[in-house]
Every structure is written in structure tokens, then in C-alpha cells.
């Protein structure tokens, strides 16, 4: 079985948790996507922000991590859940 496109995999993962930041998303997807050249924090943050712009995710909060870097938490919206149910095969959910 193949892999979902990375952005779709991010949305699918967000459907399984109450909220997550980019590091948590990447840790969860690393077993499947960690060897990809594009498995980089800036790109995965872009995936999260793009899904937010499209109404599938929303910001759940923010704070500073232990390195004093900004950490943005996201959560899935009802539209995001509907998109997962409608467009992502049950095999991947």
C-alpha cells in the first residue's frame, strides 16, 4: 500500500488527536515519511498553516517551548473531519 500525500497525511493525523504542534505531527509521521527529502519542519508547518487557511484546522493556542521557540498548537475543525471522512480511504484512517 502506498502513502498519502504529506498534507493529506497531516490532516488525517490531526483527525486522531485533540491538538498537536508541528513537532508532534512530524514525530507521528516520521515512520512513514521520515526518509522523504521534504520531511522538514518548515514544510510541515506550511502544511498545517495551509490546512488552517482552508478551514480544515484552527489554532488551538501557542506558547514557547523549552528552547524559547514559538510553538503553535492546531486542532481539526468540523470541516476537516468531514474532509477526512469524505476524501481519505478508510484504509488510511
Regions found by a protein language model. Give the residues of each.
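Short alpha-helical segments that sit at the start of domains
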Residues: 1-19, 92
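General structural signal for alpha-helix termini and helix-helix connectors
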Residues: 12, 16, 31-35, 63
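Short acidic, hydrophobic short linear motifs in intrinsically disordered regions
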Residues: 20-31
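Short, positively charged loop/turn segments that connect secondary-structure elements
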Residues: 31-45
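Short, hydrophobic-biased segments on the C-terminal half of alpha helices
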Residues: 45-52
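Short, Lys/Arg-rich nucleic-acid/phosphate-binding segment
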Residues: 61-72
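Short, amphipathic alpha-helical interaction segments positioned at domain boundaries
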Residues: 72-93
Amino acid at each position: 500500500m502506498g502513502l498519502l500525500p504529506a498534507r493529506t497525511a497531516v490532516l488525517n493525523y490531526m483527525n486522531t488527536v485533540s491538538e498537536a504542534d508541528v513537532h508532534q505531527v512530524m514525530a507521528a509521521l516520521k515512520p512513514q515519511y521520515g526518509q522523504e527529502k521534504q520531511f522538514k519542519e518548515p514544510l510541515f508547518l506550511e502544511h498545517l498553516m495551509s490546512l488552517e487557511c482552508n478551514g480544515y484546522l484552527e489554532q488551538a493556542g501557542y506558547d514557547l517551548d523549552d528552547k524559547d521557540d514559538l510553538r503553535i498548537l492546531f486542532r481539526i475543525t468540523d470541516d476537516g473531519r468531514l474532509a477526512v471522512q469524505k476524501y481519505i480511504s478508510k484504509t488510511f484512517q
